[in-house]
Amino acid sequence: MKIVILGGTGLIGRALEDKFSSEHEVECRDRSAFSSLEELLPHLKGSDLVIQLSGSIIAKRWTKKHLREVWSSRVDANNMLAKAISLLPNKPRVICASAVGYYPESDCENPLQEIDNEPGNGYLAKLSVAWEDAAKSISSDVIILRFGVVLSRKGGALKQLYLPYFCGFGGPIKD
């Protein structure tokens, strides 16, 4: 099986490559694959599965410029992926990332249920809705995974949280 991981140089993409590469042909591409349709299309040809994880890091200062980059690297990338896949004679299965930012805020007394499918109101919710709408335009059976904060010893948020907790500045972790 040929698996193409878009956003494959990130934390999750590298972990998936490690997992799948012993039994499958895996091609990992960074966001530069979305520089043009002509750049993206050759990577998708002959693929059985496309995992779309690409997107600019959110954990930076939220300037207008950065928020436009975050939006474009997700929504515009999924729109380009939809266009590219529509041009393929054999359509691969597609898995797309999204974020738990889709959901509205909730508390422990009124926990949110997956069946409560109404999005929140903030920037991340609006981004997630547009991101998922673009993903749904790829295929009627696209799989959308809503990720939260990913913790790993290999990078990501855990690496940034470690020092404050180690120094005693982290708050309690509880329900």
Describe the function of each predicted region.
Residues 79-120:
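Conserved Rossmann-fold NAD(P)-dependent oxidoreductase catalytic core, especially the SDR/UDP-sugar
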Residues 109-126, 161-162, 166-171:
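Catalytic loop of short-chain dehydrogenase/reductase
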Residues 119-142:
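Active-site Tyr-X1-5-Lys
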Residues 141-144, 148-175:
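NAD(P)-dependent short-chain dehydrogenase/reductase
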Residues 34-80:
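NAD(P)H-binding glycine-rich loop region in Rossmannoid oxidoreductase-like domains
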